Amino acid sequence: MGLLVSNGGNMGKYSKKGLYSAYDKNHKERDALDYYSTPTEEVLNILETMQLDIDGIILEPCCGGGHMVKGIQQYTNAPIIASDIKDRGFRDDNITLAYGQDYLSDDYPFFIADYVIMNPPFKLIEPFVIRSLEIAQKGVLMFGRLQFLEGQNRYKNILKDNPPSDVWVYIDRVACFKNGNTSIKPDSVQAYAWYYWDKTTSTKETKLHWLWSKKHQ
């Protein structure tokens, strides 16, 4: 795939032991609370809405059950690398898959990609964004709670100097399913948005957009 692999990268205060362990030492608790699958149709929805011209390698660093990857594949034939700290059974011979990979560790093998597209665990959203902005050469697209835009730490560590270029706020609510289990209706539905950092521009302005989910189009 022509991907340059190294063990470099500078995560400053987040390096050394890996950010997963730094933010939450209890893997079982984190796994139980933080894996919520992204609706595949909403991945296609945002890519079609943005009309993102993807030219290069895409990295999905927390692929879970492959819901995000499947949406990307419906939009583009660009090469995809997908990884996760846990093997949830997702398989696809058309992409590069790497399980048992801690995205926030200094040992993570994929340190350069053109795009990062992800829905990170919310408790780790800050270090995931920081790492993604280091890795991505062209852009970072993230699905996450609207709550990401608030908070002193996130403002200080990310939003002040690296605000997203565009934010698409859902007009209606989108359901994400715990542990990827679509047979269990979520107890509550969060307010979500898509965030895009355009690495090809130096602008620090953020454009705000509104987005209907696929079910209301």
What label would you give each PLM region?
Residues 2-217:
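Class I S-adenosyl-L-methionine-dependent methyltransferase catalytic core
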